[in-house]
Structure formats: structure tokens, C-alpha cells
């Protein structure tokens, strides 16, 4: 079976269990070659289940039935996870291979901690290697033992371990739990959300959110984890942090559209613009901003629409949109990115991969707030491959922008809160790049491709009472033509916020696309209360009335639209067709 095939089988068994189709789950697991190692335990659970069924059939009261069923579900989920790991071992999975390597070494996390501490104390170059080893160990172990948890806590509470290294290890816990569910790792992440350095807290909070989405159907079975999540929700900053993470997650889900838009519109038009502007003067050694200040270039750019598109993408970036994926996705082929650990490594200007070169420019790259860490490494590595003269030009251009960034940073009113936002944004972008570009990405579920059922996530679903967050989610669904989900979100938004013509129009359009014409008409009519002269709304409402058989009302609305747009040929044709 291929990696994709076994992941699909694992998901099928998991769905049986979570939907409480236990007989199908038993049958599927017992027929699976790689669950034979646990077949005795599976049969034990099956006999307990049959006993419950016999009690139920006999009408015997059993107050502990739900607890027993929950325990059976947890056991079956564990066996299903273990069988998947065994199968992936047979398929030579790189993740499972890493796990085997560390198991065969016989060295525990505590020993790796000692090695890292020793290397740091003497400023040895081996510290990088030991940090990578700890990351790989944490990420590759399917489940943490009690000792693993103890050693991991020691690492995170060791004041001598740099904050950047701890932030790196947070990502390792996330990757490990994302690859194979582990309540111990998730519990560790929850504890790291509560206190400590903002870089660690930001990554931990984002990791918990992403894992809660990944395992939204599974989490309610783990009562201790739910209790920890409820404790986390008591923190004063919880709701603000949750909103920041959720909004960045949805911004990241929009990356594919932004990338396609950049490639199809901005980049394509820039190429045409450059080709058409060869004769325009003052081109040499100028930045794009300088060129656009040149009167000739400025006029040409305005006529071509490029300046408008650049402003549009600048606005997208200012709102948290990921505009760098289009460029840096092509710069992830360096050997540096063959290592799992390096995709989540906080940017270090003096990292050994640079061989001591480019330190001045790397220091500037480190302070670019809108660029995620893996893109910073891509950028810095790409600069190593260009001639020194071109590199100097890049440095001179960056110095001016760097001063602007410093001034902007000095004007922040909430440095701690803005730092949290930056960490969350860049970390989630790093996760996005990993799941889309890592060469072994097929071993992982793409969190950005699954249905984001936030409303079903325990504790975190409180965010569905926040209008700005619900509006963002609704618009995300709407733009991607997920009309059923968008309609549900718009209904939620109308229940918790002030109504507007735009919300009613979008909601009406969703219901129209779902062929729920009575509901669509209701939404359009409410939109017209706010703005009775909107031709678009009048026409769409008329179409719904026409399909519903109310031709008289459709004609009235078409006539209203005609009065506003008398020369609209399409509108006149619609009226003529209705009058036939």
C-alpha cells in the first residue's frame, strides 16, 4: 500500500470509530495486516462491546455505558494509530525511519539535553547539530513516554537554552502530534501557551489551534485535554490570541488564490510592461519605486494598470495576506530544506549554512517582520549565489527600507501584542510552506486543505461569537464558492452583528446558488431595504422570483432595475424574455 493509501485507510477506520460504527471499525482493523500485532487487544475490546450490546438488548440499565464506549473508542483510535505507524515502517516512511534511528541509538531526550547544554556552555558549533537532533527526536516519536515528557519539560524550563531553540522545539512537538496524534505532546503545547517568552507562546498557541482543527472530531474524547483547554481560555489574553491565530489561518488558506493572482496578473503584466518600456529613459540602477516616480514610467504604469495592482497587493500584504509564496516557493530546492528541522528554524544570521558570509545583509533580513523564517533562509541563500556587485546593490536598496521598518517599529503602541501577531503570522506561513513544499509532504494531512470546522472545536468555538472573525470566515467560503458553509457563516454573522446590505446580498447569492430560492428572495428583499437602487440585487431577486413562478413580482423588479440602467442590453433582454 502507498503512503497515501494507508493514510486513507487510517482515516476510514478513524471515521468508523468517531461515528460510533464500532462493528465496522473492528472488522476493518482486524482485516488489516499491520494490526495483527494488536489483534488480541482488539478482540478484547470487541468482546466488551458485544457485552454492552447484550445488556442493551436485554433492557438492563447500565449507567456506565457511555464511559465504557468512550474507553473502547480511545483504545481503537490508539490501535489504529499504531497500525498506521507499523505500515509506514514497512513502506520506509522517512518520519518512521527517524523514529527507528533514535530508538536504535538507545539515547533518550535527557541525554540530548545534556549534549546541547554542554555545547552551548563552550559556544561549540556542535550546538546546531544537537538542537537539530532534539527537534528530530521530538518530531519523530509517535508517542511520548512519561520520561520523554519529563525531559521535554526540563528543556523548556532550562534558562540556558536560547529562546530561539525552544521556539524551534515547539514546532517539533507540533509536527510530531500532527503526524500521529499524541495527547502528551498536545498537553505540553497547552502548558507552553500559558507563560514564558512570547516567541514560544505564539508558536505554541498557533500549534494548539492547528491541531485542534486537525483533530476536532477526536478531541472531545480526551477529557483531560479539554480541561486544559478550558483553563487556557480563562487567560485574559485568550480571546485576542485566538482571534489573531484564526484570522492568520484563514489568511494563509487564501495564499493559493493570492499566488495565482500575482502570477497571472501582476507578474505577467510586469513582464509586458518591461518589454514595452525599453525605450523609456532612466532605467539603469533604479529600484521599481524609483522608476515609478520617473514621470515617463509613472504615466506608462498608470496606463497599464500596474500601479493599481501593486497598491492592491500592498494592501493585501498589510492585511496579513501572504504575497511572498509566489516568489519563495521556487527557492526551496536548496539542500538546506531537505532536513525536516530546517523548515521551522528561527532565522539566525550566523547559521553555519552561510559559512560566515553575508552577515551584514543577513542581520537586515532577520529584522524583516513580514517575511517568515523559511523565506528568510531562502532569500539569504539565494544572495550567496549572485555576484558581489549585485549583492551590494541589494544591500543598498535594503538599507533604505530597513530604516523605514525601524521607524515603523518604534511607533508601535503595543509591542508585545504586535510581536505575538508577527510570530503567529510567520509561523503559520512556515507551516503552510512545509505542508505544500516539503518533499515528504504526502505523509502529512494538509491542514489548509481540510474543512476548517472551527464551530465544532471544543473551547475554541467561542470565537464564533466574534463578528470580525466570522465575517472573515464567511468571506473565505464565499470567495471559494463553498456556498453552503458561507451561507451558514453569514447567518451566524447576522445573528451577532449589525446587518448590512452587503451581508444580505452575499447571503442571498449563496442561497440562490444552493437553489434555495425562498431563502434567497428573503435575503435580497432585506438587502433592498438598505439600498433599493442596487441593480445587481434587483436583478438577482428578479431571477429568484421568476424561477419560483412569481412572474409579476419578477417583472416589477426588472422594471425597477431598468429605470436605474435603461441602456443595459442584458437587462432589456431579460424583460423581453419575461414578457413573451
Annotate the PLM regions.
Residues 342-531:
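Alpha-solenoid helical-repeat scaffolds
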Residues 7, 203, 468, 502, ...:
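Start-of-helix register in tetratricopeptide repeats
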Residues 2-58, 238-239, 247, 252-404:
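Non-catalytic protein-protein interaction scaffold segments in large eukaryotic complex-forming proteins
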Residues 22-23, 179, 483, 517, ...:
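TPR-repeat structural position
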